[in-house]
């Protein structure tokens, strides 16, 4: 019985470690919106998918600002397709209050975001990793 419990905990630990290893996890700086404001998005696991939560907001001068959107999901239901590609998710644009189907492409410290409506995908810009 002890051996089964230890094996189960070890397997769960390996699965958690594999999930934590996704290279998109971490903090990302968005591109400025139409008002020049930008944010820091924390990408993390949400169950078996990936989501991104707005954790800090900044004004056009780069100073931190208060926002009712802090703590809200900006990206959700994203899944890894391998090779730095992600799809199947949604992205919410707070300044337009619109939600789009989304896909992402990770390349080093750059995360290209696209929002899609009716099969037409629009470049959502390239987010930069925050160290």
Where are these regions (language model features)?
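Positively charged n-region of N-terminal signal peptides that target proteins for export
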Residues: 1-4
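Short, low-complexity polar/charged micro-motifs in intrinsically disordered terminal tails
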Residues: 12, 126-128
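Central antiparallel beta-sheet cores of small beta-barrel/beta-sandwich binding domains
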Residues: 24-101, 128
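Bacterial N-terminal signal peptides
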Residues: 7-15
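Short coil-to-beta-strand transition motifs
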Residues: 22, 36, 120-122
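Short, exposed beta-strand-loop hairpins at the edges of beta-sheets
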Residues: 94-96, 101-104, 110-124
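Sec/Tat signal peptide C-region and signal peptidase I cleavage site
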Residues: 15-21
């Amino acid at each position: 019985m002890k051996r089964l419990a230890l094996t189960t905990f070890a397997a769960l630990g390996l699965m958690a470690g594999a999930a934590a290893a996704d290279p998109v996890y971490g903090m990302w700086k968005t591109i400025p919106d139409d008002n020049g404001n930008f944010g820091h998005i924390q990408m993390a696991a949400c169950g078996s998918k990936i989501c991104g939560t707005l954790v800090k907001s900044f004004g056009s001068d780069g100073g931190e600002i208060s926002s009712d959107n802090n703590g809200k999901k900006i990206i959700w239901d994203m899944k890894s397709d391998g090779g730095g590609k992600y799809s199947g998710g949604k992205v919410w644009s707070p300044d337009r209050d619109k939600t789009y189907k989304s896909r992402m492409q990770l390349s080093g410290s750059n995360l290209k975001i696209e929002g899609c409506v009716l099969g037409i995908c629009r470049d959502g810009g390239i987010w930069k990793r925050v160290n």
